[in-house]
Design a protein with these regions (language model features):
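Glycine- and acidic-residue-biased ligand/ion/polar-headgroup-sensing regions
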Residues: 53-71, 128-148, 160
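Non-catalytic surface loops within mature trypsin-like serine protease
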Residues: 28, 41-44, 88, 108-110
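An N-terminal amphipathic alpha-helical segment
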Residues: 115-117
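Ligand-binding loop in jelly-roll beta-barrel domains
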Residues: 80-113, 167-188
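A short beta-loop-beta micro-motif enriched in histidine and acidic residues
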Residues: 32-33, 44-57, 99-101, 120-132
Length: 188
């Protein structure tokens, strides 16, 4: 299991040049990737970059509210973990940003079976997949890798905005009372 803390994020310009994103995971490395996890700074209204051939999930982490124009309607992301799922070639734009903030982006090649779960305080979730990411949005989040989630297993704590990434894994995610996390599971 790999833990990616915010200090290890790799900053890069958006594909369309309208902002900055911080890449956490690119799997496999290079182009074309199958999975990409990033955190984008949202500072002003701007169009989203197109990623044809991918499915995307976007969740507000902090700041906002942010209003997104999508499919002829406005979607307001006001609280942490408010989100939107869309295809990578959809025309999306942030049209209003009340306070600068950040969002979490999961991008997965369309051919891969994948799902995202928002996990809330006090929960325990058991997940298995070809690849799994757990992103700590808020509070205490622990990830336990291993089939038994017992004494010999690898238990890691995630700090705010930390991410656990593992491949071919079976994990348990344990959340403190006030915790909030997003989990991406690439099915086997």
């Amino acid at each position: 299991m790999q833990i990616i803390e915010p200090t290890a994020w790799r900053a890069q310009p958006w594909r369309n040049g309208a902002g900055v994103t911080h890449e956490l995971v690119r799997w496999p490395e290079g182009e074309p990737f199958a999975v990409r996890i990033s955190v984008a700074d949202i500072t002003a209204p701007a169009p989203f970059s197109a990623f044809a051939g991918y499915r995307r999930w976007l969740y507000l982490l902090e700041g906002g509210p942010v209003t997104l124009a999508h499919a002829g309607r406005d979607v307001v992301l006001a609280q942490p973990a408010d989100g939107l799922a869309f295809t990578g070639d959809a025309q999306i734009a942030a049209t209003a940003v009340a306070r600068p903030g950040r969002d979490l982006n999961f991008m997965v090649r369309e051919a891969l079976p994948a799902r995202v779960q928002i996990l809330r305080g006090g929960a325990r979730a058991e997940l298995a997949g070809a690849a799994i990411a757990v992103f700590a949005i808020a509070g205490e989040v622990a990830v336990v890798a291993g089939a038994g989630a017992g004494a010999g297993d690898d238990r890691r704590s995630l700090r705010r905005h930390g991410c656990a990434w593992c491949t071919d894994a079976q994990i348990a995610v344990e959340l403190g009372a006030d915790a909030l996390a997003a989990a991406l599971v690439i099915e086997r």
